[in-house]
């Protein structure tokens, strides 16, 4: 009964048990061996287990195989000689001749002829007897030689009373013979598995016909020098399966193999059948198949895909065989799976861009040496193999950042400067928008400086209180507007060459002047933009639930909607002096405050210094957005929305805008799509390089701020892309012990669960993190320290997880958005549901995760990190 438990155990456990019994408990070892012989051949499912056990018991070395072959030959010769002598003796005595002859014929394997009835002489018997004695002597000498070989190779204890030489050599011979049989069987299976599949191309069994759509078009033809107009039906090309048995068979094979190629785990459950139907629909739409062909392919696929073929069954048998499992276990050991799980570390990167040597940048020595850690830490089990790194705080990276992010826009060795806007274009085309915003905003009050200081966390709060005290004794002056820049320590997905970004803050004294006016009135100004557009436009002030509903409502306004993604390449760098003055005109129009106007004027000319390593960089730039300014986000939204509104007005189109600063999506009717072809040239007049993305015609394919709309229980919600799993598995925070790691996992998980309740895959991932953290409680301050600014915007203060079931409808919508079909979703969720993420700190740099990004349809170059 005890031995039967081993049938379900792992290969490693069984082998460890056999080794222990052989070395310590020989009686149990032989009982186990006898039990294996008893169950062998009784049940096919157990034969693989028996073979695996005997294979481990054998543990054959190369020298034994040669000895076993020679021993088998000698033993056959001895048995043949002994049976022949026995036959001759029987013939001499005339008793038992038939039995002796049969035995001899069997032992000689029919290879030696001996008459059945004859009377051998004494001399014949003596000759045969001498031959047998000689063979026995040679066999004995061989056994002595073999025993010495075993002592030399395996030591004295290997051949003993429990494991005699002859039994061992016979076992080796049997195992080798079985291995040869298995090799022949494997070759047969291999030939069957690797035989080419006869799948015809779609175009060979389909034909294209033109059919009338029911719509008419006006056609103008010239006849006898005069134009004649008449209506003609609009024709459309439709593909259909040929009406032959051969074509239908070919189509059946094609659709079955096509769907299995996309997902080989589909079976006959409700979700699988829905997935199969959607795959057929997608294929039909792609190749413009008629409804009859789609229906036929759906019927065929629903029957053929869920039923495994003999090849599928054999493939599964090979993959799950004891030998295959044993080899995978050995690879796991070599890869240190289980030993390298935990929080690993990756060092920072140096930008590959060369230094241009711009004369505008002055580098001086003598600064205090600064050492900043640029390591990034990631959870080895969940990072999906996506490589995130942070830039080193080096002189090279600093120079690249200043040259490529402040002065030039090119990627090569030549200095290419940003385009300049046309003279007075902002005033000429956007003056109406500026006045409309000022009118909508109305009165805005200036808030107390103490309130501004108290809105920051402890460290910054003390600095602001100090600045407030300073302003009471020393009035604001221009030097307060000077900028001290530093390299932004952020996660970069290393899919392309990257130039690090800069943060360019001014003094706390300066920020108090702007913050008391602008920070607390930002929402009011953003709502004014919504009022001018006539619908919610700046979506950064909404959580992902509300954003999804707003975008869906915008989409439903149009009969045939299309979404055009727009991204302003390095927006801050392209904000010109003219754009800044236009933006400042709005603030001055709202507040009418001379102190604010003076501070805003000091944003036009920027004196910047930067400390890195033991160097100080100085440079000066006119115009450009300083990313550390309090009005950075609001100003970018005002400029972008103003330009877009003026563009819509110029085109005379009805369109909806989704804006979050430099990231925009235009939603309009498909009939207006061509009108936006000149967008790049239009915005170039304003000094901006505007990059348009490929238009999308399905709501789930609309991407905004690295998220897409997914219908969760019938309500659209903005859901982050699957690669967010890899990003949330990395942190820039210092982790000193396992408690820190668990706090980090808990903070990420709690926020992730709020945003992704009821979302396929993502909910399971964040539940996995939360469970692995031990459901650790963390402070609100720690949560804000861990999560990114973008995540905090999506949350909008939410902290409560609402348990939401994952429905089939949600799974199908998630598939439409991200290309991960429902069955793959379930597989990934099972992986996370059974995973415990280790909080162990590891010193290794790179490990390969169990779950790779390819399973989640994450393209290698899908990144919004600009170079």
Curated annotation (Swiss-Prot):
Record keyword Ribosomal protein present: no
Molecular function as annotated in GO: nucleotide binding; RNA binding; RNA-directed RNA polymerase activity
UniProt enzyme class: transferase
Catalysed reactions, as listed in the record: RNA(n) + a ribonucleoside 5'-triphosphate = RNA(n+1) + diphosphate
Keywords noted in UniProt: Nucleotide-binding, Nucleotidyltransferase, RNA-directed RNA polymerase, Transferase, Viral RNA replication
Known EC number: 2.7.7.48
Stored Gene3D superfamilies: 3.30.70.270
Domain RdRp catalytic intervals: 561-676
Biological processes annotated in GO: viral RNA genome replication; viral translational frameshifting
TM region(s), chain numbering: none
Coiled-coil regions listed in the entry: none
General function of this protein: Probable polymerase.
Similarity annotation: Belongs to the luteoviruses RNA polymerase family.
Name of the featured protein: Putative RNA-directed RNA polymerase
């Amino acid at each position: 009964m005890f031995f039967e438990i081993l049938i379900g155990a792992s290969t490693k456990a069984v082998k460890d048990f056999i080794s222990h019994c052989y070395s310590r408990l020989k009686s149990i070892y032989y009982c186990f061996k006898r039990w294996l012989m008893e169950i062998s051949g009784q049940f096919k499912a157990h034969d693989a287990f028996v073979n695996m056990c005997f294979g481990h018991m054998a543990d054959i070395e190369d020298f034994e195989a040669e000895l076993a072959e020679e021993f088998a030959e000698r033993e056959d010769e001895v048995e043949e000689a002994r049976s022949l002598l026995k036959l001759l003796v029987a013939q001499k005595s005339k008793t038992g001749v038939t039995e002796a002859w049969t035995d001899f014929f069997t032992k000689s394997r029919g290879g030696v002829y001996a008459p059945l009835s004859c009377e051998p002489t004494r001399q014949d018997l003596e000759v045969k007897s001498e031959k047998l004695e000689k063979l026995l002597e040679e066999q004995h000498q061989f056994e002595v030689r073999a025993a010495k070989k075993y002592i030399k190779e395996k030591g004295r204890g290997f051949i003993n009373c429990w494991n005699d030489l002859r039994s061992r050599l016979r076992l080796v011979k049997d195992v080798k013979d079985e291995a040869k049989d298995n090799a022949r069987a494997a070759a047969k299976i291999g030939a069957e598995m690797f035989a080419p599949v006869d799948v015809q191309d779609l175009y060979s069994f389909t034909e294209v016909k033109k059919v009338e759509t029911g719509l008419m078009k006006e056609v103008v033809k010239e006849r006898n020098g005069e134009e004649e107009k008449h209506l003609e039906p609009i024709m459309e090309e439709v593909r259909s399966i040929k009406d032959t048995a051969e074509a239908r068979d070919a189509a059946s094979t094609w659709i079955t193999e096509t769907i299995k190629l996309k997902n080989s785990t589909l079976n006959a459950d409700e979700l699988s059948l829905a997935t199969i139907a959607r795959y057929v629909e997608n294929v039909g739409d792609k190749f413009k198949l008629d409804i009859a062909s789609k229906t036929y392919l759906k019927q065929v696929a629903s029957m053929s895909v869920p039923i495994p073929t003999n090849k599928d069954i054999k493939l599964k048998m090979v993959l799950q065989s004891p030998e295959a499992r044993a080899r995978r276990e050995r690879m796991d050991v070599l890869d240190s799976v289980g030993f390298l799980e935990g929080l690993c570390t990756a060092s920072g990167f140096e930008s590959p861009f060369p230094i241009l040597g711009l004369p505008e940048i002055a580098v001086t020595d003598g600064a205090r040496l600064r050492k900043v850690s640029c390591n990034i830490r990631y959870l080895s089990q969940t990072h999906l193999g996506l490589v995130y790194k942070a830039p080193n705080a080096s002189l090279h990276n600093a120079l690249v950042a200043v040259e490529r992010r402040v002065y030039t826009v090119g990627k090569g060795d030549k200095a290419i400067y940003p385009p300049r806007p046309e003279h007075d274009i902002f005033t000429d085309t956007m003056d109406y928008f500026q006045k409309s915003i000022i009118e909508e905003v109305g009165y805005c009050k200036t808030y107390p400086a103490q309130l501004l200081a108290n809105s920051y966390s402890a460290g910054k709060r003390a600095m602001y209180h100090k600045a407030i005290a300073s302003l009471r004794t020393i009035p604001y002056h221009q030097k307060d507007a000077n900028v001290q820049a530093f390299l932004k320590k952020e996660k970069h997905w290393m899919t392309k060459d990257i130039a690090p970004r800069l943060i360019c803050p001014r003094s706390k004294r300066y920020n108090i002047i702007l913050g008391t006016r602008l920070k607390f009135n930002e929402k009011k100004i953003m709502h004014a933009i919504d009022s001018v557009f006539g619908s919610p436009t700046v979506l950064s002030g909404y959580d992902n639930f509300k954003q999804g509903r707003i975008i869906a409502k915008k989409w439903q306004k149009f009969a045939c909607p299309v979404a055009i993604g727009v991204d302003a390449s390095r927006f801050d760098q392209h904000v010109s002096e003219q754009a800044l003055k236009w933006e400042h005109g709005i603030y001055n129009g709202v507040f009418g405050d001379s102190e604010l106007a003076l501070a805003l004027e000091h944003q036009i000319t920027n004196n910047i210094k930067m400390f890195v390593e033991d160097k100080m960089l100085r440079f000066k730039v006119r115009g450009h957005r300083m990313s550390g300014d309090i009005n950075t986000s609001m100003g970018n939204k005002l400029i972008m929305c103003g330009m877009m509104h003026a563009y819509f007005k110029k085109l005379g189109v009805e369109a909806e805008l989704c804006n979050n600063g430099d990231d925009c999506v235009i939603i309009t009717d498909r009939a207006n799509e061509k009108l936006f072809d000149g967008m790049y040239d239009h915005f170039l007049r304003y000094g901006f390089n505007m990059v348009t993305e490929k238009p999308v015609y399905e709501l789930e394919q609309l991407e905004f701020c690295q998220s897409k709309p997914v219908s969760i229980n019938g309500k659209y919600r903005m859901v982050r892309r699957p690669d967010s799993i890899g990003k949330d598995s990395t942190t820039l925070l210092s982790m000193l012990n396992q408690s820190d790691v668990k706090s980090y996992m808990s903070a990420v998980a709690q926020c992730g669960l709020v945003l992704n309740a009821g979302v396929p895959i993502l909910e399971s991932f964040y539940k996995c993190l939360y469970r692995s953290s031990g459901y650790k409680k963390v402070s609100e301050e720690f949560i804000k320290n861990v999560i990114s600014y973008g995540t905090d915007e999506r949350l909008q203060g939410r902290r409560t997880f609402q348990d939401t079931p994952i429905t089939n409808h949600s799974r199908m919508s998630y598939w439409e958005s991200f290309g991960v079909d429902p069955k793959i979703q379930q597989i990934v969720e099972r992986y996370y549901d059974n995973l415990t993420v280790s909080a162990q700190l590891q010193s290794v740099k790179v490990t390969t995760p169990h779950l790779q990004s390819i399973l989640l349809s994450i393209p290698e170059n899908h990144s919004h990190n600009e170079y």
